[in-house]
């Protein structure tokens, strides 16, 4: 492997990783984080009621609509709504949160379909959570690579944790790197911040010590010469590793690495 810096102080490296991992688990276990999700519902044109949300829900050309019964109310963008309320057309990978008592009702769109995802802080998956197991951090797994942009972003269709659902991402390029004497590559998608990247992958540990379907790695923006650092110590589980109520994307076929990435997060202890 080509590591970022062989002189990295292991104490500092470990402390920074531990702080990062605590933040990641804290967000996951937030009172309305993904561990609080109690259902994944797909509204249709025919109105229907869901057991963990108020009102009767439907969707159509104007977006998702809820009809709240007597005594039922939601708070949307700080405003109390009663009776009939239409949330409007939600963009792909967008969402709106409506507050219902101490719960939040997420209204979102994934793979071209509207969904309803209630989040209740008392959900057993959240209250029983003890933290995500992971490999011990090791600077050897902070691998230097090269980002090679495509002439134009390539629309890339991938599967999802929900059977029959598909996601489409623009892939701006690929990352080439070496591990165990082998040159490997990963198709990259855009990250959460401008210029940053994200890769979805599986490897030889998938289904053995790490979650079978996918892991994600967020990568800082490439340097002027295309240099990037893939710190596999920060390879994370997606929500689908913890719950069936997630629509997580699967890696593109070319991102199935033939080596064991013995770094990052492992299969969770808790799952519902």
Can you say where each PLM-predicted feature lies in the sequence?
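Acidic/His-leaning functional-site neighborhoods
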Residues: 176-223, 233
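Long, compositionally biased interface segments
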Residues: 28, 220-272
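Hydrophobic, proline/glycine-rich low-complexity stretches
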Residues: 2-47, 68-72
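Broad, structure-driven detector of short, well-ordered beta-strand segments within folded domains
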Residues: 54-62, 103-109, 184-188
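Surface-exposed beta-loop interaction hotspot
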Residues: 103-171, 178
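Forkhead-associated
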Residues: 42-91, 223
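Phosphate/adenylate-binding glycine loop and adjacent helical scaffold
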Residues: 79-105, 114
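Short strand-coil-strand connectors
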Residues: 51-53, 77, 99-101, 178-182, ...
């Amino acid at each position: 492997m080509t590591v970022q810096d062989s002189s990295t102080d292991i104490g500092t490296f470990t402390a920074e990783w531990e702080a990062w991992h605590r933040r990641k688990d804290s967000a996951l276990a937030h009172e309305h984080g993904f561990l609080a999700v109690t259902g994944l519902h797909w509204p249709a044109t025919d109105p229907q009621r869901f057991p963990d949300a108020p009102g009767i829900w439907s969707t159509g050309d104007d977006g998702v609509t809820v009809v709240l019964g007597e005594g039922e109310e939601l708070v949307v963008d700080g405003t109390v709504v009663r009776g009939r309320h239409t949330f409007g057309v939600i963009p792909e990978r967008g969402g709106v949160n409506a507050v219902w008592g101490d719960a939040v009702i997420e209204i979102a769109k994934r793979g071209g379909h509207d969904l309803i995802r209630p989040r209740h802080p008392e959900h057993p998956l959240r209250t029983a959570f003890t933290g995500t197991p992971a490999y011990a951090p090791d600077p050897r797994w902070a691998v230097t690579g090269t980002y090679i942009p495509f002439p134009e972003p390539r629309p890339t269709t991938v599967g999802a944790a929900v059977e029959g659902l598909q996601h489409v991402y623009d892939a701006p390029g690929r990352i080439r790197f070496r591990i165990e004497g082998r040159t490997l590559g990963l198709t990259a998608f855009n990250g959460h911040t401008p210029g940053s990247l994200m890769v979805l992958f599986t490897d030889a540990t998938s289904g053995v010590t790490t979650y079978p379907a996918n892991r994600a790695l967020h990568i800082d923006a490439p340097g002027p010469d295309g240099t990037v650092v893939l710190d596999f110590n920060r390879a994370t589980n997606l929500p689908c590793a913890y719950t069936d109520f997630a629509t997580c994307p699967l890696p593109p076929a070319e991102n199935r690495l033939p080596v064991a990435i013995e770094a990052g997060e492992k299969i969770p202890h808790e799952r519902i």
